[in-house]
């Protein structure tokens, strides 16, 4: 009977433990990609610049994803970025990063 009670307690504890509902870093990077692509679509730039930026967007997306994962960005930051609807909102979310996380993000962007 005692063993049965222990099993019930273990099951109850497991049921109470839920996985974080915060979006993963891939979703953060995907939102950045969507916003950057949309902004580029409306930008007044010459075709060569548009092509060059378009070609860089996947690398920028991947660098953001890696910085997010490697820096263990908080659920609050990830949620903020996924909900961002424009570049200014995304930048506001970046202000929630720690100094070290922001430095790592800037460093990864500088290598592109």
Give the role of each language-model region.
Residues 1-4:
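Positively charged n-region of N-terminal signal peptides that target proteins for export
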Residues 11-12:
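Repetitive helical segments and hydrophobic/amphipathic motifs
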Residues 15-16:
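N-terminal Sec signal peptide cleavage junction
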Residues 23-45:
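Post-signal peptide N-terminal segment of mature Sec-exported envelope proteins
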Residues 50-112:
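Compact alpha-helical subdomains of small soluble proteins
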């Amino acid at each position: 009977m005692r063993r049965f009670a222990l099993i019930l307690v273990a099951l109850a504890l497991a049921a109470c433990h839920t996985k974080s509902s915060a979006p993963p870093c891939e979703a953060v990077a995907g939102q950045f990609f969507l916003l950057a692509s949309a902004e580029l679509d409306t930008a007044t730039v010459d075709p060569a610049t548009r092509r060059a930026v378009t070609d860089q967007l996947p690398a920028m997306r991947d660098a953001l994803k890696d910085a997010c994962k490697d820096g263990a960005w908080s659920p609050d930051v990830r949620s903020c970025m996924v909900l961002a609807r424009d570049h200014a909102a995304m930048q506001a979310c970046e202000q929630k990063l720690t100094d070290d996380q922001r430095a790592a993000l800037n460093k990864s962007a500088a290598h592109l």
